[in-house]
Amino acid sequence: MGTRLQGRVAVITGGCSGVGLAAVKKFLDEGAKVVIGDVNAEAGAALAEELDVTFVAVDVTDPDQVQALFRTAFDTYGSVDIAYNNAEIVPLDDQSILTTDLDAWRRVQEANLTSVYLCCQAALPYMLEQKHGSIINTASLAAVMGSATSQISYTASKGGVLAMTRELGVQFARDGIRVNALCPGPVSTPLSQELIDSDPEGAERELARIPMGRFAEPQEIAAAALFLASDESSFITASQFLVDGGISGSYVPPL
């Protein structure tokens, strides 16, 4: 058990699986009180039984439900110190701009970009009152580099998250609030496994361009989120925090 988040209250969306669940466990291990917001009510209820957490079933695209999530955190624990806005979707019908229809485009924008807007909007009043807080928004390597294996709406949504994060980080820097974009490269999660299964050739190409030769584990991305949530990153705000196995720094990956 550590103490890096001792006495802090953290809201983590998408906390029932993958990177979100890894972050829940890391934050708990470092002393935080954690509120999980997730659409999966069954998994959330099980985690509330298993771990010392509060679970709120939430559709992160619904303004009232998002407000209720953060209000629950404040009413239960007395503050909102950390918002890790991590919920996202990566649907199989989001591909090339030539084949992705408007419904798929809008669905991804709502889940990946509008949700972050709503969560920041809900968290900030508590943090302004407290005069401190850390917001971590899940962007992506796709926000800073183009990909030939396109997921057009996903890429655009994450670019929006990164731009919004920079603006909020600058706007609220003198209010004691830090806002950073966590930009993972490929991660081994149930979502990524779906994509691998649907396009094995694309997955092989993806793996070949990673200098470290593998996908990240959820715990590795969660460790970066923990750093950004803690006082160890006290002079970091409005940043793009890349955790990508060297992809963004490589021209030709090693053989």
Please identify what each model-predicted range represents.
Residues 2, 94, 226, 237-255:
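Short C-terminal tail/terminal secondary-structure segment
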Residues 9, 16-17:
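Conserved glycine-rich cofactor-binding loop
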Residues 41-42, 58-69, 102, 219-220:
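The beta1-alpha1 cofactor-binding region of Rossmann-like NAD(H)/NADP(H)-dependent oxidoreductases
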Residues 94-97, 101-106, 206:
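Substrate-binding pocket helix/loop in short-chain dehydrogenase/reductase
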Residues 120, 157, 165:
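Active-site helix of classical SDR
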Residues 125, 170-174, 234:
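Alpha-helical segment proximal to the catalytic Tyr-Lys
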Residues 140:
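Residue(s) in the substrate-gating loop at a strand-loop-helix junction
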